[in-house]
Amino acid sequence: MMPKRFNTSGFDTTLRLPSYYGFLHLTQSLTLNSRVFYGARHVTPPAIRIGSNPVQSLLLFRAPTQLTGWNRSSRDLLGRRVSFSDRSDGVDLLSSSPILSTNPNLDDSLTVIALPLPHKPLIPGFYMPIHVKDPKVLAALQESTRQQSPYVGAFLLKDCASTDSSSRSETEDNVVEKFKVKGKPKKKRRKELLNRIHQVGTLAQISSIQGEQVILVGRRRLIIEEMVSEDPLTVRVDHLKDKPYDKDNAVIKASYVEVISTLREVLKTNSLWRDQDIGDFSYQHLADFGAGISGANKHKNQGVLTELDVHKRLELTLELVKKQVEINKIKETDDGSSLSAKIRVRIDTKRDKIPKHVIKVMEEEFTKLEMLEENYSDFDLTYNYLHWLTVLPWGNFSYENFDVLRAKKILDEDHYGLSDVKERILEFIAVGRLRGTSQGKIICLSGPPGVGKTSIGRSIARALDRKFFRFSVGGLSDVAEIKGHCQTYVGAMPGKMVQCLKSVGTANPLILFDEIDKLGRCHTGDPASALLEVMDPEQNAKFLDHFLNVTIDLSKVLFVCTANVIEMIPGPLLDRMEVIDLSGYVTDEKMHIARDYLVKKTCRDCGIKPEHVDLSDAALLSLIENYCREAGVRNLQKQIEKIYRKVALELVRQGAVSFDVTDTKDTKSLAKTDSEVKRMKVADIMKILESATGDSTESKTKQSGLVAKTFEKVMIDESNLADYVGKPVFQEEKIYEQTPVGVVMGLAWTSMGGSTLYIETTFVEEGLGKGGLHITGQLGDVMKESAQIAHTVARRIMFEKEPENLFFANSKLHLHVPEGATPKDGPSAGCTMITSFLSLAMKKLVRKDLAMTGEVTLTGRILPIGGVKEKTIAARRSQIKTIIFPEANRRDFEELAENMKEGLDVHFVDEYEKIFDLAFNYDH
């Protein structure tokens, strides 16, 4: 389809691009006085800076292909935009609201506002968006538009110190303001203003004003006659007409033909102008068009604008267009050949390390790349594909360090405590040393939040001298994030595994899958199933990424996963992992971490010196036990930071910290180094302040007092801790000094670690045959069943111990577990419930320093439980000295640190009879 011709009846046609190119609405033509002008109505996005492109008047024509991946059909759509012609024959197009007046009446002499252009002159026939920051100028432009005289003069700024700026964006935004001359007599100001701009410019019509952006359409040449006013700069101008010339002159014709021939070479390299018909342009229009689309500098273009001899103007344009042809040829060579050469160098460099099946694919794609033109969309796709293939670290491995002593030192530096976890990691490294490699193992670090799972993974990588890459899979629901997108999708990319190898630059990094228990799942696939191929040692040697479509070797990668709850990990995935539990930190470990790490780090981060504040050990202990009982130390760090922020505010209010004695009014006179400020006396500081700000005597006295004031060291202990962190979050768990009849202390495991739990029983009513049990406390099904079993076992034991006691047969009982708002479940309270029932039946108190835990069977056997470490910590926190554990948990308790076991009287039982003796026969 050939470009349509336009008549000169004043119609204009707006070509609207698809919605995703909706920021640009191009006006195909603006006709006036048998001329066609380029125009635009649009809102320029922030990424497009007007006036900086070598072809600034065409920037918005080029913007779609620069900012988006247009295909050929899109370029064809925009290519059929205008016929730059003064012919009136052709087909009438549908009219829209005309930008230009259909019947303009312009005098040869006009008074217009002069707008300075910093980067390039406005060539007649082209449009140019500019930014106007000056409110007076902007208001004047809007007023001229309302009065049906939307014309201004556009003049190129001369090169001078007052307008040059190191920041191009600053020049664009403030060029009108910088153009002003201040502090000189009126006559000199006017003369200097006129000397700053070229006298020959362009009469421009205001196409639209949107905010601070004004779109100008070049109309004709003009020259400044005189200045009318300064603010805004208004000048009287005259139109410049081309000198007469002979169209039949052979020399002019030859220049015209040569310009057309050369210009067509330029148009071929620009997909937006490739279909432009320039054969029917007039001589002067052809010269202007060639200069406008060339990448010439502003001085060359100003020369074309100033030249009124059409033949000389054609010669100037021919010079510019020839230079543009040479530039385009060099650019084609650089963009096409150099890109191909880079790919070839990469392939040849790594050829010995790249697998043969990958080399075959690379060669096929490289051959295809050499046959494609750079402007084709397939060129970018092929280059991108080869780029990813060639940047992967084929055969590049980092040296693995299996020094166990070094690894232990690194783990101790990064983490305090966690001795069992460190020991397990050292075992893993030792096995790797004997085997010569650590591949084939997948470690899963399981534990509550804040215990250091992610940082341990990073420490393992540092100990092994492997590169580290963290991939958070929490909430991940798209398989393509792992295995990549197919190349047929727009914006396709490789998966995270390929991106990881590219990022770290080695083929044997340590990849950490963070929060693997929180994987999502949706219609796009199951990421957990995709991870099976990634982490399975039998499959990941030939891992297939959908984007690359070639197999890559992940068998040398060491995978480490982190999870809070391993039960949430799919079974097949969990089966491939070796789980290491991080149960958390005990109080002693938290104290060391807080004192040796967290407090020091927070001091540095808050800019507080150690001599400014004293945080006592008692305050830290109270903070740990009453505010931060969770297994990790993340919340403990937050609370310490909260304390030191308040301390910082208090110190600043006291004037204890140094302040910056500077003032923006005179930065040179106040510039002092830190050491100089420290050596300065108060009087010297006051002199500087007085000279810079002119403060009154009263103000100087106050500031002197502020600097000279001595500060009081902030003391924080258990008594005033609440002033910094608020009231305690956790109350003391021990409710009773001596538990009453029917009340027994049990031990429970929670996500916060461990806690004590009271089991309370009382009777509701008594009467012959009214025996029964009512349960409250938001208990789960397992715990309710455990209560029923405990009730039955207690009746049996009571019948054996005291056959005449009919308490259970004639009493309706109510069992309650306090903190009813907290859901509770689990079987480990069975023995505690039995003891509570028996205490009520015998009306006998249970030993006051006793806590117990253990699941009970219907025959009275005690079964093992979990969370021995956490429950032991909870017992110590409540000053419990005697603990009853199931016999099967003896080994778990013996593995605990000595400081945790110290001072405890622990009994291990396998049947309830032993618990009965410990709980009720304490007198003996």
Swiss-Prot record:
> Keywords, A to Z?
ATP-binding, DNA-binding, Hydrolase, Mitochondrion, Nucleotide-binding, Protease, Serine protease, Transit peptide
Annotated GO MF terms: ATP binding; ATP hydrolysis activity; ATP-dependent peptidase activity; sequence-specific DNA binding; serine-type endopeptidase activity
Q: Active-site residues? A: S828, K871
User: Lon N-terminal domain spans which residues?
Assistant: 112-325
**EC number(s) for this protein?**
3.4.21.53
Q: What's the family?
A: Belongs to the peptidase S16 family.
Q: How does it assemble?
A: Homohexamer or homoheptamer. Organized in a ring with a central cavity.
Q: InterPro entries from the entry?
A: AAA+_ATPase, ATPase_AAA_core, Lon_bac/euk-typ, Lon_lid, Lon_proteolytic, Lon_Prtase, Lon_prtase_N, Lon_prtase_N_sf
A Gene Ontology annotation in the biological process aspect, one of them, is: oxidation-dependent protein catabolic process
Read off the lineage from the record.
Eukaryota, Viridiplantae, Streptophyta, Embryophyta, Tracheophyta
* Known role: ATP-dependent serine protease that mediates the selective degradation of misfolded, unassembled or oxidatively damaged polypeptides as well as certain short-lived regulatory proteins in the mitochondrial matrix. May also have a chaperone function in the assembly of inner membrane protein complexes. Participates in the regulation of mitochondrial gene expression and in the maintenance of the integrity of the mitochondrial genome. Binds to mitochondrial DNA in a site-specific manner.
Task: Give the main location.
Answer: mitochondrion
* Name of the gene encoding the protein in the UniProt record: LON3
Cell compartments where the protein resides = Mitochondrion matrix
The catalytic activity, as recorded, is: Hydrolysis of proteins in presence of ATP
- Disulfide-linked positions: none
Please name the Gene3D superfamilies in this protein's record: 1.10.8.60, 1.20.5.5270, 1.20.58.1480, 3.30.230.10, LON domain-like, P-loop containing nucleotide triphosphate hydrolases
> Can you tell me which residues the record assigns to a coiled coil?
none
Where is this protein's transit peptide? 1-63
Q: Record's GO cellular component, any one?
A: mitochondrion
Where in the numbering of this chain does the Lon proteolytic domain appear? Answer: 738-922
Question: What species was this sequence derived from?
Answer: Arabidopsis thaliana
* Name of the protein in question: Lon protease homolog 3, mitochondrial
Residues binding ATP: G447, P448, P449, G450, V451, G452, K453, T454
